[in-house]
Curated annotation (Swiss-Prot):
InterPro entries: PPIase_dom_sf, PPIase_FKBP_dom, Trig_fac, Trigger_fac_C, Trigger_fac_C_sf, Trigger_fac_ribosome-bd_bac, Trigger_fac_ribosome-bd_sf, Trigger_fact/SurA_dom_sf. It comes from Rhodopseudomonas palustris (strain BisB18). HAMAP family: Trigger_factor_Tig (MF_00303). Keywords: Cell cycle, Cell division, Chaperone, Cytoplasm, Isomerase, Rotamase. It is found in: Cytoplasm. This is Trigger factor.
Length: 453
């Protein structure tokens, strides 16, 4: 075996490899010798088939099988001796001329091939004990609990007919029928019958609900509006429209009395039990938000302290996945790059940066996990599957079967568990300080937020 490195460009490596015909022949002979005691041929006793006869019958297929195995073993040896961790599957270029292939299979010629790969860079991990991470913590206030219960009450409130001669006010529920036109022409989706709308709920396009204030039952009005420029249907986006609208029923919201009886309608023994449940849910929500903020800060820190070239092929794969998703989302929502105030080139550049970050962080997290023997147990994966099944009542068996028979889906379920365990490992070493914040501060938008790995 002869190996010559021909390319060492960044993370790209390429080798020219020669496997001598004599070495291939020796492997073929050993394989045929092993076969002679197992092959059954008419006219020969078991174990008495001449090697020459076997070679005439099986020589070509055995040689091809042997060459394939030798290439695999040789490549493994090349990569192992050099300490390579592969980022991509090896790309092998074999002789293509028919006469060359025939010479190799006949054992008359050496096999010359090239193998090209991208390797994972050597990653020098930072000292995680030097990391300082601020952990925002928000306490659940009584006012938060009251607000949550008020929202529940608002969502469950009843409405009563306002009676003859009444006019619609903000907060009222109005049942309407409408016919929409653009430049006098009806359009798809512009007609509705018996539609209920709560004035002020912002469920209709801007300006529509406000023009219902003062309308009476049986009254017809022409509402003039303009579809938002980022409207989901691109054919309607930014266009002015008129809706001939008739109100058929006017209803006023009834005040909800938040007491034990109200709690019982929701399945709780008392108002105190309802408040207890609401506090527990809010506590879990705040803890989840805290976790996401801490994780984001930590991933940003890992990004800052681990700057290296990511394997281009992995970045391209990640970008392709993201870009297909973005394009599909834009098409389904009727959006364009112009409506999003950008260009396709600028968007691609931004998402390539995100793809590069994701790949680098993925490699860093993998390196940390590998060096510190962090693993995901089968029990942890099973619990995740069970939790996913609980989210789909009535389809638990189908969910379980889906993951049991889909290795890729199971790997996708395992990945975030692994990531969280690595994050927890780093946080154990880092200097984490808690900071009490308000609910608003905990949930505020962070302009510096970056897409996590």
């Amino acid at each position: 075996m002869q190996v010559k490195e021909t390319v060492a460009d960044g993370l790209k490596r390429e080798f020219e490899v020669t496997l001598q015909a004599a070495d291939i022949g020796a492997k073929v002979a050993a394989r045929l010798d092993d076969m002679k005691d197992k092959v059954r041929l008419n006219g020969f006793r078991p174990g008495k088939v001449p090697i020459g006869h076997l070679k005439r019958i099986y020589g070509r297929s055995v040689t091809a099988e042997t060459v394939e195995k030798l290439i695999r073993e040789t490549n493994d040896q090349i990569f192992t001796e050099r300490g390579f961790r592969l980022a991509t599957e090896p790309k092998i270029t074999m002789p293509s001329k028919e006469n060359e292939v025939e010479e190799i299979l006949a054992g008359k010629s050496d096999l010359n091939y090239t193998v090209a790969v991208e390797v994972v860079p050597t990653i020098e991990l930072a000292d995680f004990k030097s990391f300082s991470v601020e952990k925002p913590v928000a306490e659940v206030a009584d006012s938060d609990v009251d607000e949550a219960i008020n929202r529940i009450a608002m969502g469950n409130r009843s409405y009563a007919d306002k009676g003859e001669g009444a006019k619609a006010e903000s907060g009222d529920r109005v049942t309407i029928s409408f016919k929409g036109t653009i430049d006098g022409t009806p359009f798809d989706g512009g007609t509705g019958e018996g539609i209920q709308v709560v004035i002020g709920s912002a469920t209709f396009i801007p300006g529509f609900e406000d023009q219902l204030i003062g309308i009476g039952a049986g009254e017809t009005r022409t509402l003039k509006v303009e579809f938002p420029k980022n409207y989901t249907n691109a054919e309607l986006a930014g266009k002015p429209a008129e809706f001939e609208t008739t109100a058929t029923v006017l209803e006023a919201p009834q005040e909800s009395v938040i007491d034990d009886e109200f709690a019982k309608t929701l399945g709780f023994e008392s108002l105190d039990k309802l408040k207890e449940a609401a506090r527990g849910r809010l506590t879990a929500e705040y803890a989840g938000a805290t976790r996401q903020r801490v994780k984001r800060v930590l991933l940003d820190r890992l990004d800052e302290t681990h700057r290296f070239e990511a394997p281009p092929s992995l970045v391209e794969q990640e970008f392709d996945l993201m870009w297909r998703s973005i394009k599909a989302e834009m098409e389904s929502g009727g959006k364009t790059f112009e409506s999003e105030n950008t260009t396709e080139e600028a968007a691609k550049e931004e998402y390539r940066k995100i793809a590069d970050r994701r790949v680098r962080l993925g490699l860093v997290l993998s390196e940390i996990g590998e060096k510190n023997k962090i693993t995901v147990t089968d029990d942890e994966v099973s619990r995740a599957v069970i939790e996913r099944a609980r989210q789909m009542p009535g389809h638990e068996k189908e969910v379980w079967e889906y993951y049991r028979n889909n290795a890729e889906a199971l790997a996708q379920l395992r990945a975030p568990i692994y990531e969280d365990k690595v994050v927890d490992f780093i946080l154990e070493l880092a200097n984490v300080t808690e900071k009490t914040v308000s609910r608003e501060e905990l949930y505020k938008d962070d302009d510096a937020e970056k897409t996590a790995a």
